[in-house]
Amino acid sequence: FFLQHPDVFNKVIALSGVYDARFFVGDFGGDEAIYQNSPSDYIWNQNDGWFIDRYRQAEIVVCTGLGAWEQDGLPSFYKLKEAFDHKNIPAWFAEWGHDVAHDWEWWRKQMPYFLGQMYL
């Protein structure tokens, strides 16, 4: 939602996500609704200065673990990071350890940690 509406939010924390819609639907062709919800594609093609400026002013955290059940999301995590770097959008892409699983136990630790880093 943040990438579509950076005028509404100026902070975002994304935990353990899959950021490429192909993981869920395969090749989505020209389906605009799916494209709009595939962040790793959407950000690569976003060239509107209004959006880019707001992304650059926002606080963005994207975090993944490297443990159980996180492997499916890692390719899109790195693809999204590459897109942000290419667009010079500052964001904190955090990789937690190999013991960090795709699970509530870890999200309950990560969310307060990152909120504290954002001074919220």
Pin down the residues of each PLM region.
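Non-catalytic cap/lid and distal C-terminal segments of serine-dependent acyl enzymes
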Residues: 1-120
